[in-house]
Amino acid sequence: LYQASVKTGSGVSSLKEFEIEVDTIINIGKKIWAIVEAGKPVVNVEVNSASAMPAGVHSWQQLEDWQIPRSSTYRIHYTNLFGMNVVDFSYRVMFTYGGSYKGHGRYVTGATILPAALDVAWGFTFKAAVEIPTVINLGQAQNPIGGIQMNVNWSVDTVVKSSQTRASYFVDGLGNLKELN
């Protein structure tokens, strides 16, 4: 059990008790966000991301021992019957790993998928979105390891055809990145 000083609307500080549960991992962040809409990358003022943190922790800054972020770039492309590229999309899977709370566990923060490059030919519409279906504990209650599954869903549409595809990735607090397809 921990105590924290909390500012109230009247400017008076009060003490609030709260509990950090290192054995319960939660997602701090959005579960679904668009990264490409109407064939153009979505520009965000703040990066949409997910985290696998202990319950009761509200910021990655409450943890220590973070490692350098990992990143891997993936590319998809579609060609027409003439062999011309009609959609060429590159995206990055990024995350920071290894954070611990008072020496316990290995957690993930800043897990995201960002557009790196996009070219779409005339007559084609490309859309992509990211979803975080699950955040889990890969370790034990005394020494949790946060894990996050991330899916990137995209569609390529023309007047006569629509195609939808998904790629899935899993990242964890030990720094592992695995393609699930």
PLM region descriptions:
Residues 3-46:
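Membrane-inserting effector segments that mediate pore formation, membrane fusion
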Residues 45-181:
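Mature extracytoplasmic or otherwise solvent-exposed domains
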